[in-house]
Each structure stands twice: as structure tokens, then as C-alpha cells.
UniProtKB/Swiss-Prot annotation:
GO terms for cellular component: cytosol. GO terms for molecular function: fructose 1,6-bisphosphate 1-phosphatase activity; magnesium ion binding. It comes from Nostoc sp. (strain PCC 7120 / SAG 25.82 / UTEX 2576). PANTHER family: FRUCTOSE-1,6-BISPHOSPHATASE-RELATED (PTHR11556), SEDOHEPTULOSE-1,7-BISPHOSPHATASE, CHLOROPLASTIC (PTHR11556:SF35). This is Fructose-1,6-bisphosphatase class 1. The gene is fbp.
Amino acid sequence: MAKASESLDLSVNESTDKALDRDCTTLSRHVLQQLQSFSADAQDLSALMNRIALAGKLVARRLSRAGLMEGVLGFTGEVNVQGESVKKMDVYANDVFISVFKQSGLVCRLASEEMDEPYYIPENCPIGRYTLLYDPIDGSSNTDTNLSLGSIFSIRQQEGDDSDGQAKDLLTNGRKQIAAGYILYGPSTMLVYTMGTGVHSFTLDPSLGEFILSEENIRIPDHGAVYSVNEGNFWQWEESMREYIRYVHRTEGYTARYSGAMVSDIHRILVQGGVFLYPGTIQNPEGKLRLLYESAPLAFLIQQAGGRATTGLVDILDVVPKKLHQRTPLIIGSKEDVAKVESFIQNGH
């Protein structure tokens, strides 16, 4: 009995130690572990991720009080560079990212889908070697109905001095990304990121005010039951995409899930498997999603988890944009499910 008791004690202690290790693994510590370095570059990237986390905390706090505060719900009455009506939360979140990175000393430029041109921070530009590209609020239409939203981010190394202020060095493929990820504002606030060494998730512990490691080296299933697409656009798509939708309707084992916030849908697919689709339409074959701020960051992350991302014809990470706000179709998720969609599209061409 004594030996059995000792064995049980050891098992409990090991379990407790693992839980403590996880609880002590903050985002900044994890980044340094992933880079296996305490060099100046590694410290800079750790600081950058901390700044992104701070922006996420501020946005999460604002969203948690959305029904109690002025200036959170509804539209501003303005239209952004994409021709879309601007929500008040879009403006707030965009301003949060700018304010947070103004103080970092690490970022010279921020490029957002809410801004016509990159935002330069002159005092940072002599030393700031990085550019942050981001979608401050994904799914902002969900704000007024208290549904999940997200933020998407990508970090790139600045190339050249960008003396003409055109940010032409950003017009490169998605494989130039150093890091990418998203923040999900749901029942809990989660930050999921990759630096090219796997995909890792963190959950905001409100009592500590820290993002704590939830899961390391997440792998997306090769196949999943979920397909996530706005079927309200059915008659606007090419016939090949409509044929795919008819296929999943008549094939047992598929289930539709679509929230109106891509980050939320992508997170479900990362965990459960499946495919997210935002195809182009007959009138707008280039699609709706922004390559640099939405499609490429999520493609980098999903591919690091063992999934795939494509336009239907070309790997998303191989697409070279011709302009900052370039749009692209997106099919992303489990590799078998993405391949199935591709087969319909490519046969349709």
C-alpha cells in the first residue's frame, strides 16, 4: 500500500508540476523559447508580441463593456478605403494598435485595412526594423449582437529605407512573414500565433492580466466535418463553387458553421478540422478578403499547423500583391478538405 501511495503522490506531483509550468509560460517567455535565443532580435520580437497582446487586452476590455459605454456600438457614418461603412469599434481598435506601437520603438510602419496608406512613426523609423500589418477588428458587424470577433496580425521585416513612403517592400509573397496570428474575442480571449515553428495558443487570464500558454504545436486534422461559407452568396459564385456546395449538401457527414467573423470560424477549423471558403464571385473574381491583412497571415498560421490555404488555383503564400489593399479568394483549412474544393474549381476551369 505504501508503494501504491508513493506512486500516486509522484503522479499527482508530476501533474501539478506540468500545470505550474504551463501557468508560468507567458507569451513573452514562450516567444524566446521558440526562437531559442536571447539575442537582441529575439528580444525585439518578444517585445513586439507583447505589444500585440496589450492591444488585444485593451480591445477585449472595451468589448466586454460594449453595452455599457458610449462610442462602441454602431457606425461612424464614414466609409473606409475598401468602400465599407466603418463601425465605431473598427476605429477604436485601429487607434489602439497605433497607440500601443507608437511607444514600442520597434515598428516604423503600421499597415491596416482601415487606413488608405501605411501609418509611419517617425521617431521609430531610424531604429524600427519591423512592419505590423493587421486587421484591427475582423467581423465588426458582430459587435452589436454580442458575438465573437477577432484581430489578425502579421509581422514583416522592413527591407530598405522606404524613402519614398510607398512601402513597396511589402508587395512580396506571404513567405516573407516573420510571425502571424490572431486574437479571438469570445467566451475567453485567446491569442494564437506562429513564428514558423508550429502554432501555439494562449488564453488571457483576467486575474493575472497575462496570456498564459494553453496548447503548443497545434495540428489541424487532415479532414473535418465543418464547411464554413456564406451560402447567401450562392448565386453570385461560379458554377464550380456551386457544384461543391451541392456536393456537401448531398454527402453525409458534413455540417455548416458560419459566424460572420473569419477568426472565429478559422479557430473552430484549426481545432476540429474542416474548410473555410470565401470565394470570388462572377462580378468580383478577385474576392473580398485582403491578402496582406487577412488571407496571408491566416494562411501562414494554418500551413504551420499542417493545413493548406489557396485561392483555388495558387497557394496563398505564393501570391505577390500589386497593391497594399489587394483582395484574394480564400479556401483554407484541413488539407484533404481544401483539396476537395480545389478539385471542383480546377475541373471547372
